[in-house]
Amino acid sequence: MILEHVLVLSAYLFSIGIYGLITSRNMVRALMCLELILNAVNINFVTFSDFFDSRQLKGDIFSIFVIAIAAAEAAIGLAIVSSIYRNRKSTRINQSNLLNK
C-alpha cells in the first residue's frame, strides 16, 4: 500500500469531518462528523505505525484506545442528544441553548 494514497484518503476524511462539524446545525450530524475525524486520525496512526516500524504495535494499540474513547464519546453524546430532544423537541444546535430557559 502506498503511503501517500492512504494519507490523502485520511486528509479527505478529516476535511469532510471538519467541514461537516463547522456547517452542521444538527447535533447527531455533528457527532457523526466528529466520529469521521477520529476515524481519519486512526487511519493515520495505523498507517504510520505500519510504514515506519511494522514490528512494534504502538500505533495499532493507540488506535484501539482511540476507538474505545470514541465509542464512549458517541454513547454519552447520543444520551445527551436524546435528553435534549425529550425536553426541547429539537436536535438543532442553535435551538438548544440551555442557559436561556
From Swiss-Prot:
**Location, primary (coarse class):** plastid
Which reactions appear under catalytic activity for this entry?
Answer: a plastoquinone + NADH + (n+1) H(+)(in) = a plastoquinol + NAD(+) + n H(+)(out); a plastoquinone + NADPH + (n+1) H(+)(in) = a plastoquinol + NADP(+) + n H(+)(out)
Q: Topology with regard to the membrane?
A: Multi-pass membrane protein
Name the family: Belongs to the complex I subunit 4L family.
- Quaternary structure? NDH is composed of at least 16 different subunits, 5 of which are encoded in the nucleus.
Q: What does this protein do?
A: NDH shuttles electrons from NAD(P)H:plastoquinone, via FMN and iron-sulfur (Fe-S) centers, to quinones in the photosynthetic chain and possibly in a chloroplast respiratory chain. The immediate electron acceptor for the enzyme in this species is believed to be plastoquinone. Couples the redox reaction to proton translocation, and thus conserves the redox energy in a proton gradient.
Protein name per Swiss-Prot or TrEMBL: NAD(P)H-quinone oxidoreductase subunit 4L, chloroplastic
